[in-house]
Amino acid sequence: QARGLRVTIQKLDPYINVDPGTLNPYEHGECYVTDDGAETDLDLGHYERFLGIRTTQANNVTTGRIYSTVIDKERRGDYLGKTVQVIPHITDEIKTRILTLGQSGAYDVIITEIGGTVGDIESLPYVEAIRQLRLELGEGQSMVLHLTLLPYLKAAGELKTKPTQHSVKMMSENGVHPDIIVCRTEQPLSKEIKAKIALFCNVKIDAVIEAADAKSIYEVPLLMQQEQLDIICLKKLNITWYPEPDLTIWKGFLDKLYNPTSTVTIGLIGKYIELQDAYKSILEAFIHAGATNECKVEVVDIHSEFITADNVDEKLQGLDGLVERMGQKALPLGRYVGQKTVDGGLNGIRHQVKTRNK
């Protein structure tokens, strides 16, 4: 995108739920709602924050939605009485969903993330759809990037490449071979490790990318640029008409993020505070707002069920501000999140109103 290309990202989730709207936040994190009202995966929030774009229902597809669409078509008679099968009907619907964004003409590059793990039975139709799609699109029109983990054994002091070798082998057995392998790692990759992965996974050594742990997720694009991931991707896609990337604004954001001049403490009242992903967009908003104002935002998690009229002063002591997040559905709150949660949230709000009015 920094090179002037129009980019969007979509997420394919292998679970059978039609959308994440009814998933327990403890299991799946927050449900991210797009501008068109679609209830989607929380990753779409990351896509919007990183690219500065707006996503829609087309950016998030689940197995449940795929099957629902295919069954509806079968009930209408669209398949003319044919036996409906995973291949070709389910895989065709997956391919249609992948191609929809590209056919809009609004983008130069579509990044499609397939959730789950290679070898999961739920992921097999997606891998097969990718195999077919690569063949149909032709050479230079698509590429496959495989994200893998390199475990580090502290006792032995070495990185293990076997899991990566086996996952690539499993992908290849299903007809899909990665063009690029991105290795998540705690330790830097030596040339020997990269060469070993390249040899056993049948990719060029410059297509083995180190993705080391970063201080902030917003540092990752700069780390990927250092590994020349962008240049390799452009070559694989036969894209040659691009200017040099300008990441000045991005680097300025990171500089402010890492060098705050002040600190504020904000309380977050919620029901699912044990899992950070349950309130991911709120926490990321604090990061963005803090960096913009050169301020570090320290968030204090407060479980709404444990706030009472007797202890509210103690629970909210020393806070500069408060965000309250009780429920996520347009249902009677007491039924959805529990009356204790509602009462605790209201106690917190009343306390803040009184404090501000003094």
Predicted stretch roles:
Residues 297-299:
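Carboxylate/His-rich catalytic cores and anion/metal-binding grooves
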Residues 171, 342-348:
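Compositionally biased, intrinsically disordered low-complexity regions used as flexible
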Residues 336, 348-349:
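Intrinsic low-complexity/disordered segments
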Residues 350-354:
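Periodic, rod-like helical contexts
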